[in-house]
Every structure is written in structure tokens, then in C-alpha cells.
A protein has these predicted regions:
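Short, contiguous acidic/charged loop-to-helix segments that flank catalytic cores in large enzymes
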Residues: 28, 287-309, 334-342, 363-369, ...
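Short, surface-exposed amphipathic charged segments that create phosphate/polyanion-binding patches used
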Residues: 272-274, 372-379, 420-426
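Conserved S-adenosyl-L-methionine
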Residues: 174-278, 283-293, 298-302, 333-334, ...
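Hydrophobic alpha-helical scaffolding
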Residues: 129, 149, 203, 231-235, ...
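Accessory, often C-terminal, charged low-complexity segments
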Residues: 282-304, 311, 344, 349-352, ...
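Extended hydrophobic-aromatic, low-complexity segments
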Residues: 285-289, 329-330, 339-343, 359, ...
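Non-catalytic, mostly N-terminal accessory regions of nucleic-acid modification and defense proteins
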Residues: 1-195, 254-267, 361-364, 382, ...
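Conserved Class I SAM-dependent methyltransferase catalytic core
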Residues: 17, 24, 33-46, 239, ...
Length: 524
């Protein structure tokens, strides 16, 4: 009997092969540790390959006697690697029982030899994890196959980006905060256009905002050297991820002296940024003590943000860092659009100060960390009419001081990775073209309000609606089901649920009393 033809094996990409190899670490290390194990090895391989290429070039141009001269490496932004830090040494010892110690030693000596990497690399990390030697050797073999010299295809950047997204996806809801999906970062960059000046991210995670901004500048033939990067990150391991991510791509940045809390230990107190991009933690509770930061200069002119939620703390931190013509694009949970109390007072002041330029509701399931819908806020310190030359292009901005653009992108997006979606290049182009047309002179011909998509609201309209920034309060919806006042509906449900819970507690207390009076006390 003839044998059935075997199915051809599905070819997998280099990234997928690496992911499979990294996946074998499961069981050897905690899930949250995977990314640090793998990405640090990527960095080691990348740094070593660049070093070897530079070493060869020095030898050919100046002779062997200069190959160990550190200055010949640093002048070209290449890290100098002592022999025990080189990838060739690691691979020679990959099957040895003490390979974890050798990797730790390699990373330590690289950081010691290169002040620019201070605080970037793991310290005594691999030895502490007690990773199975065979699994670690297998991972090293896969990483060894990467051709980091393929500049045209940005192999190492591609791999690093792929792994950051996969790790965020794997960690899922409640974790993965170190990573903002690329399509969202691209949207922010395309809207605020960070061509020239200081770019700041107060909660920079693994540095995705910086990486995509530099790609944006490059794609538009701008000069990356005209952009200075400043950032801050609270989590030490993520701070290291960011430093490695930027180093791999040759992006220099000031991330402060250490990983630190942006609110209580601001690493850039006097900074004024031309562009701010951020994805702060959503609805962060107890971010300051009751009597802490009450007279912080970042709140000048505004109410002190409440301790119960950091959303408006992040907003005011961003406002305080904007330069005279600064623009910010950042993400917040939708609740910040309509919060009452202190938040309402701050929001009203922001609107009255002509800082809010655009509010954009994003589709659900864009993020790996939450399934809630999220808002992109655009703040602009100067909404007056002016002429600006950006990247050799003259733009004539009209006065938008008493206007806010509202957009709803919930009908956009394409399926991506399991249950998630992403904004395609076409989606983003549609959004940014509408936004930029609305900003500029001649908008009467190039911009129009579109039901279920966008609406330009006047200050008076916003004031009339109690300074809520919920887009559905302004954008016209053709479908009646879509025209539900979400904010009012949710507050009504909130009130009903509160009444039900109070009634439930009373019923439970009454029931316990009855049983006790019958002599059958119930102890909970």
C-alpha cells in the first residue's frame, strides 16, 4: 500500500524559531523573567558582533596594535568588550555547567568597561535563576544564528521588537505594562510629529515611544540628531530593558540617574519638552500619601490631584513639562474624560486654558494588558494661529483656542494575534489626515464633521455639557444603539448597583439576626 505523502513542514521565521527556543525556558524560570533572560542575551550578541566588526575595521585601517584601544570604539558608538564578554567566548563555553556565571561575568564586565551602559545590564542574574544548562545552551544556539549585521532589514531591532510584543502578549491582562502596541505608538508619533526638539516620556517602559519616534523621523527623511530624548521609568528591570532597547538601535537618551517614581523622585525637574508621548498606568490608586506632594509645583494653577487615582496627576505632570509650543499625546482610561469632583475642576481648567486639542476614543482590544477602551489625549500649549516650518514643510496653523476635535475610532481596526486588533496603516492615515486638516488654514474645504467618526466642538458646547470630554456627547451617531450616553448610563447603573449591594447587606444582617434569635447563630 502506497504511503501517504507527508505534509511539507511549515517554514517558520527566524523570530518564531527564537520564540520556540525561548518558550523552552518555561518551567525553568518564572514567566515574568523570560523576557529579561532572552533580551539580555540578544544584547550581548548584538554588542559583540558590532565590536568584532569594528575590531576588524581598526585592524585593517590602523594595524593590530590599535585593536584594544577603547577610544577607537567609543568614537563610533561601539561598546568595547573585554575578551570574557565576547559572544565567541560565551559560545565556546555554552555547554559548560558554569555558563550562567560566565554570562553574568560578561554582562558585568561590559557595563564596567562602558559608562554609557551604567545601570542597563542585569547584575548576577543568570546565576540566581538556576536555569537548566541544556535549555540555556539551546537558547544560545538559536541566538547565535542571528545575523545582527543585516542593517537593511534591522534584524536585531526586529527581533527585539518581536520579543517585547510576544512577551507582553504572553503575560496578558494585568501585566505587560512595559510595552505599548506599535500601532498605537505610531499613531501618536504621526499625530504630534516629533521632528525637532526635546522628546519626553514620563513612564517610558521599554522605550517603544522613543524607538517608533525615531523611525517616524527616519521615514520622513528628518534628522534624528535634532531630537533629544528624555525619559523616566519606575521599575528597575524595565529601566534596564529600555536602556538595552535604545542601545541596540544606537539611540542615546537621558533616562535619569536610576529607575525612580516620576511623582516622588522626578529625574527631570526643570525639563521643558517640545513633544511628550506617554502611556501611564491606568487608574493608579494610592499613588501618593494623603499629605504628600500637596504643594508640588507641577499642580500650580490647578487643584491637587486626588490620591484615589493618578490619572490627573499624570496629566498635570505632562502639562508642567510642555515647552511654549509643546505638544503631548498620551493614553488614559476613559473614566478620565468624565470624572467628577476634583478631576472635573482640573479638567475644566485645562479646557479653559486652551490646552486640550483632541480627544480620540480608541477601539477595544488594542492592548494586551486590558480589554477596556482607551482614550488618546492630545494637548497643545499653543493653539494660536502661526506659521511653522517642520521637516522642510511649511504649515499654516489656524487659531483653535476655543475648539476641541473629538474622534471615535471604535469601528476601526483589523484582527491581530488571538483576540486582539490593530490599527492598520490605512486607519492611521485616515485619522492623522483629518486631524492635520482640522488644525490648518483652509480647513473649511478640507475638514468636515462626520457622523460616528469626528466632530469639532466649540468651547461653549463643551461648557454646556458640563466640561465632559466623552466623544459620544458630541459626535453624531446614526445608529440609535450607538447613540447611548455612555457616561450617564454608567452612572445610573453605578447608582443602581450601589443600592442593590446596600439592600443585600441589610437582608443578610436581618437573616443572621433571625437565626440568632431562634438559637441557631451563624458564625461567618
Amino acid at each position: 500500500m502506497a504511503r501517504a505523502a507527508s505534509k511539507p513542514k511549515k517554514e517558520i521565521s527566524m523570530e518564531e524559531a527564537l520564540w520556540k527556543s525561548a518558550d523552552k525556558l518555561r518551567g525553568s524560570v518564572e514567566p515574568a523573567e523570560d523576557k529579561h533572560v532572552v533580551l539580555s542575551l540578544f544584547f550581548l550578541k548584538f554588542a559583540s558582533d558590532k565590536f568584532e566588526a569594528q575590531r576588524k575595521a581598526i585592524s585593517e585601517k590602523y594595524g593590530e596594535k590599535f585593536v584594544d584601544n577603547v577610544a577607537f570604539y567609543t568614537k563610533d558608538n561601539v561598546f568595547f568588550l573585554p575578551e570574557i564578554s565576547r559572544w565567541s567566548f560565551i559560545m565556546e563555553n555554552a555547554k559548560q555547567d558554569d555558563i550562567a556565571l560566565k554570562i553574568d561575568t560578561a554582562l558585568y564586565t561590559i557595563e564596567k568597561a562602558n559608562p554609557a551602559l551604567k545601570g542597563a545590564l542585569p547584575d548576577n542574574y543568570y546565576s540566581r535563576l538556576h536555569i537548566d544548562t541544556a535549555k540555556l545552551a539551546s537558547l544560545l544556539d538559536e541566538i547565535d544564528k542571528i545575523n545582527t549585521g543585516d542593517k537593511e532589514n534591522d534584524i536585531i531591532g526586529r527581533v527585539y521588537e518581536y520579543f517585547l510584543s510576544k512577551f507582553a502578549l504572553a503575560e496578558g491582562k494585568g501585566k505587560g505594562e512595559f510595552y505599548t502596541p506599535k500601532c498605537i505608538v505610531n499613531l501618536i508619533a504621526e499625530m504630534i510629529e516629533p521632528y525637532d526638539g526635546i522628546l519626553y516620556d514620563p513612564c517610558c517602559g521599554s522605550g517603544g515611544m522613543f524607538v517608533q519616534s525615531m523611525k517616524f523621523v527616519e521615514a520622513h527623511h528628518g534628522n534624528k540628531k535634532k531630537v533629544s530624548i528624555y525619559g523616566q521609568e519606575y521599575t528597575n528591570t524595565t529601566y534596564k530593558l529600555c536602556k538595552m532597547n535604545l542601545a541596540i538601535r544606537g539611540i542615546s537618551a537621558n533616562l535619569g540617574e536610576m529607575a525612580a517614581n516620576t511623582f516622588t523622585n522626578d529625574q527631570h525637574k526643570d525639563l521643558k519638552a517640545d513633544y511628550i508621548m506617554a502611556n501611564p498606568p491606568f487608574n493608579q490608586k494610592e499613588w501618593r500619601g494623603d499629605n504628600e506632594l500637596t504643594d508640588d509645583p507641577r499642580w500650580d494653577g490647578y487643584e491637587v490631584p486626588p490620591t484615589s487615582n493618578a490619572n490627573y496627576g499624570w496629566i498635570l505632570n505632562i502639562v508642567s513639562k510642555l515647552s511654549q509650543n509643546g505638544v503631548a499625546g498620551f493614553l488614559l482610561a476613559n473614566g478620565a474624560l468624565s470624572d467628577d469632583g476634583t478631576e472635573l475642576k482640573i479638567r475644566r481648567q485645562l479646557i479653559e486654558n486652551n490646552l486640550v486639542e483632541a480627544i480620540i476614543i480608541l477601539p477595544r482590544n488594542l492592548f494586551y494588558t486590558t480589554d477596556i477602551s482607551v482614550t488618546l489625549w492630545i494637548l497643545n500649549k499653543n493653539k494660536k494661529a502661526r506659521v511653522v516650518e517642520e521637516n522642510s514643510e511649511v504649515k499654516r496653523f489656524r487659531n483653535r483656542e476655543r475648539e476641541i476635535l473629538f474622534m471615535d475610532l471604535r469601528q476601526m481596526g483589523s484582527p491581530y494575534e488571538k483576540k486582539y486588533i490593530e490599527l492598520t496603516e490605512e486607519d492611521r492615515a485616515k485619522v492623522t489626515s483629518v486631524y492635520h486638516a482640522w488644525q490648518q488654514e483652509g480647513y473649511e474645504e478640507t475638514y468636515q464633521n462626520v457622523p460616528e467618526f469626528c466632530y469639532s466642538a466649540s468651547f461653549d458646547e463643551v461648557a454646556e455639557k458640563g466640561f465632559t470630554l466623552v466623544p459620544s456627547r458630541y459626535i453624531e451617531f446614526v445608529n440609535r444603539d450607538e447613540n447611548i450616553d455612555f457616561d450617564t448610563k454608567m452612572k445610573m447603573l453605578q447608582s443602581e448597583l450601589r443600592d442593590l449591594l446596600v439592600a443585600e447587606e441589610k437582608s443578610k444582617a436581618d437573616l443572621l439576626t433571625v437565626f440568632k434569635e431562634l438559637g441557631y447563630e451563624i458564625e461567618l
